[in-house]
Amino acid sequence: MHNYSDIQIIIMAGGVGSRFWPMSTPDYPKQFIDVMGVGRSLIQLTVDRLKPICPVENMWVVTNEKYISIVKEQIPDMPVDNILAEPEARNTAPCIAYACRKIQKKHPDANIVVTPSDALVINTSEYQRVLSKALSYTSDKSAIVTIGIKPSRPETGYGYIAAAELTSVDEIYKVEAFREKPNLETAEQYLAAGNYYWNAGIFVWNIDTISKAIRTFQPNLASIMDEMAPSFYTEQEKKVVGKLFPTCEKISIDYAVMEKSKEIYTLPAEFGWSDLGSWGSLRTLLPQDEAGNAKMGKDIRLYECKNCVVHAADKSKVVVQGLDGYIVAEKNGQLLVCSLKEEQRIKEFG
């Protein structure tokens, strides 16, 4: 088989991070925010940890049209052609198809990693080793490799990957099935079974494998891409994509391709991953005091509080007394006080 040695990386940055209101807003969502207080936004951290795998010129960002200027500002060394604008959100399959088709036009030997822009990785060297291993597997095989995260708890907020038998290559397993987000009892069964992994939304494939899969399982999507492709890298691209992209069916890559394809594999990994999907997940990652409180801000004072996460975006003084298991978050004059148990409702509040 052909060797796909030209590594390209697609970073998905179109989400609005609605569960992180008020820190994350539709005008400035969480992937562009320094959530961890380290001086770099989540998308900048993502680019930083991918640089040892390939240069920024080989990275592509797919985002909503209205965030293009933020991407240019935060990743100034990324070529403008590599920043793809979705005229409207159509879930992950159309934007991945668009990015892959645009890459294919200039990089027929592309071997591709697709990753979210807003996850956190603690152990970057292990992350790089795992991705390199997956890339070496897909470089000469028509395989799709998903990165499965070894679960550390019975998490109900993630989808799961069930692994079947090991392939002839160490660490890489055939995928038996993808499972939706489970209830607690099912999540506990998955944890006990030992062959279930969190679906991190990180995929590795070569350009021909994904092109054939989209054509086989999503012929309508493939034909819309056929219509769009002649405009890529020309003045017409924005206009043509603006007209045709919104006609794509709203569908995730998991439903569109993963659950239908036979050649799907998983590489289980442990590199301190979190999807940073909610205030609760941020609390578990920030340093906590002896009462289980995590805080980020210039002047936050807690009295008789426990298991809280308190986040103030500017120089506000925040005083919290007597709360247990609460989120207190302030930004630009917007204030959220919400029980951690009810945090899935935040996207309705914002």
Model-derived segments and their meaning:
Residues M1-D6, I207-G350:
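Left-handed beta-helix
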Residues V61, L84-A85, V114, V145-I147, ...:
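General beta-strand structural signal in soluble alpha/beta enzymes
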Residues I11-A13, V62, V113-P116, T146-K150, ...:
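Short beta-strand segments
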Residues I43, A99, D118, I161, ...:
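Residue-level signal for inorganic ion chemistry
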Residues T124-F245, Y265, K315, L340:
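Conserved core of the sugar-phosphate nucleotidyltransferase
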Residues M1-I11, R19-P26, G37-P116, I122-S132:
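Conserved N-terminal catalytic core of the sugar/cofactor nucleotidyltransferase
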